[in-house]
Amino acid sequence: MLNSKEFVRELQLRHESAWMNPNVGSADAALAALPLTRTDVDDAEARLERFAPFIKKVFPETAGDRGLIESPLTEIENMRAWLNENEDAQFAGKLFLKRDSDLPVAGSVKARGGCYAVLKHTEDLALANRLVEMRDDYSVFATRAFRNFFSQYELHVGSTGNLGLSIGIMGAALGYRVTVHMSADARQWKKDLLRAKGVTVLEYGADYSYAVQKGRERAAEDARSYFIDDENSVDLFLGYAVAARRLKVQLAEQDIAVDDEHPLLVYIPCGVGGAPGGICFGLKQEFGDAAHVYFAEPVEAPCMLLGLASGLQNAICVQDIGLTGRTAADGLAVSRPSGFVGETVKEMVGGGFTVSDEHLFTDLHALHETERLFVEPSACAGFAGAVELSKMTDYLESSGLGAHWENAAHIVWATGGALVPEGEREKYLAN
């Protein structure tokens, strides 16, 4: 295993590499040290339940889940066999895909945090203006009167693509004026889709951090504008954390035990950190030390792992060590991590892995061939981490995971893909 200094050197060399967090402690101790608690996740979960009638009405594809924005958990035995045979993986337990790539509304994990942040702000405005009480039927938010009210307000967000889609789609459905500040990495089809929804898209020839800063500045100019801050938002974080509770139910439905003798290993693609950080926080609340969470990032944009391994969090960016931040995994093309997330998960996340763009496309193609499932490149990042961890015998032995390896359940969190146009899909699969 590499120490932190050696790992940073591997990052500079653009090698696919692994870092195991030396600071990870007990889940109880890590959670007790945080200002966020189970009560905060309770509150977020209850708010999503209140808005379910509205979501079901406006987004009928959610009717099967009663207006909840949720995705399937699918065992991918054929992909597991392919990884064992072609990438020398050593999987013994079951391998699952958490298909946030197919989340309704926005087709990515950002439908969790992004939609929740919009709904939280919406409820705050509605309560402050005495439009509703919490016991009311929230389907009233779909009426013309409510849409007219929210049209007085504007939402701003900086995004590489998927967060902008979730906030733009949900915000427009509620009647807001929405402006998405897009970095140079954003895909054209995502900009086109947002504009088709009536969202204003401002394009910048710079990276994600610059787009976020511009969004923050524009929102500050108008008292009726609200900036959804991907770098520092507690609301986004809690929206993602709710996912762990839903996952717990899905695992139980498939008779998957999670305890000390049946560890749960989860591999999550990471950009600025909000989604994987919130999910990690939620998993530790639900499963404690039986949950082992690992982040996966592109070799050119490993901002969160760089911040964690160096201990500098958001005081360092990937350009500081000679990397570009540019990657085909547009959702992960982030140069500087969230300091808020880094500080929150620094004693919870088990470690992380970097993956090349070429490897992403190999796994994207393999998933499609073996399981007939399509995800976008960034959503494949977790596979490389899962494979690498399975071969790290020293770490598995020292962490105690090796003793229960045959009982482990592995979840690769697929973060986006459902909205990718057919022409783009064909290009990805041909790459």
List each model region and its residues:
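PLP-dependent amino-acid enzyme catalytic core
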Residues: M1-N431
